[in-house]
Amino acid sequence: LRLLTADFFPSEGQAEILGYSFGNGDITGLRKQIGIVSSFITERLPKHMTAEKIVLTGKFKSSILYKAYGDKELQEAKDMLISLGAGELIGRQYHGLSQGEKQICLIARSLMEDPDIIILDEATVGLDLFAREKLLRQIDRITLLPHAPLVLYVTHHAEEITENMDHILLLRQGKIVAQGAKNDIITPEVLADF
């Protein structure tokens, strides 16, 4: 995943993502095209900010608001929360949110630059059953956005694969075990070997 977000480079072979070739020029533009929700992002975010300001940090690809922003940018962050069905989080302190509410803030944050891809790495970890189901519904809403990004959803739980997820890649110890259309991969036969 860190390779996909251009945090690491391949140690062998070549990688090309969204037209950017690693090792052949500047790839800083790639980072703007990929949003990510992961524990390594969560750990860097300040807890004292409101939900919409946490979302706004995604516009600057930073864990803090070090650049000046105006009412327009802050309204964009609020609108992003509303578009994901989480308008009730506006004005609330991030540190006081439930784990599921924090995750939806991070998903909204990942969408602030209108990315082509968002990576959701174990997005439901730490959630109870009801919070998990609510978050999965909100993730499905992303596909309804005007410029819906490709959603790369990483999980260890097949039951988290939603209706709108259509392609599956199964890995075991970093190696591809199976890949293809969801209906071809999520079968008792394939999952029994996994």
Question: Which residue stretches match the model-derived regions?
Answer:
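Conserved ABC ATPase signature
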Residues: 93-97
